[in-house]
Structure formats: C-alpha cells, structure tokens
Amino acid sequence: SEFFADGRGNRQPIAGTVPLGYAMPMHKDVDGSTGESPSPYKQVKFSSGVSYFDTGRFDNQWGTGIPVNEVTPEFIARGQERYAISCQVCHGDTGAGNGIAGKYGLVAIANLHQSRIRDMADGEIFNTITHGKNTMMGYGDRIQVQDRWAIVAYVRTLQAAKASSK
C-alpha cells in the first residue's frame, strides 16, 4: 500500500494486544475486586458478549477449559442443581439420554456419554446449551452464563464418573 511509508496495508498490533475473543475473562466482581472470574452467585448475566466466557470460542475455534479460576465442588454442585432444573428432564439423571421427556415421544435425545459428545470441546458444549442443536432448544435466555459453564463442569463430572466405572 502507498498509504504507509513501509508499504504495509495495515499496522502491527501494539505489544501485549490480545485479539478480540481470545482473552480468558477476568471480570470485576460486584464487590469491586479484580482478577477473579465471575461468581455464579453474585452476578446475573444472560448477555451475548464476544469473549470466550460468553461464546465458548476463541476466534473461530471451540475453546477447552472452564473459564473460572478453579472448578470447585461448590461450582460443580451449582452445575448439578442447574442440570436438574433444565437438562435432566431430557438427558436423565446420569446424562444417558433417558429422561422422562423421551418416554413421551421426543426422539433423538443425546446420550452425553457418546464419544462424539465426550470429545467435544467445553466451548462447544457451552454453545449447545446456549443455542441448542437439532431438536434441543437453546437455553441462552433462560440460564445465566455462569450457570451454563457450571453445567458444562457437571457434565464433565458425569462423563468422568461413567468412564471410571467401566
């Protein structure tokens, strides 16, 4: 390009720049502290931002990892509670796809222990909870962002329990 003296068509990013959608979220908590991932109990958030926390994606790739400082037993318990409210009716107690809804004619309820789902990145599971897939409706407007991640953590716990029982 003739616009810049060095012939480039654009400028290089400033050192330390993180591309949009690549940074793990580190939100300010409601009490004003920084550097902590959001608490699932203190914030209400249904938003659709562009960070990994909101989308499960880094640019055009599904991300792996739960975007909290630590996946604690309390966080997994929160996921279990939210799973029981929103997911269990179809996916069943253990995630095998044998919930009560299947007994009333709903077909193709996913077994969360299938290899195709076990092999999904955490971000893809988060996206499925958010937007739905096939016959599953999306829950992005019904389940807070933090709680969707807690459900992903709980689903991973169910999968690990099933794998260890083999």
Where do the language-model regions lie?
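Bimodal feature
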Residues: 69-73, 81, 103-105, 109, ...
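Extracytoplasmic electron-transfer domains, predominantly the class I c-type cytochrome c fold
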Residues: 106-158
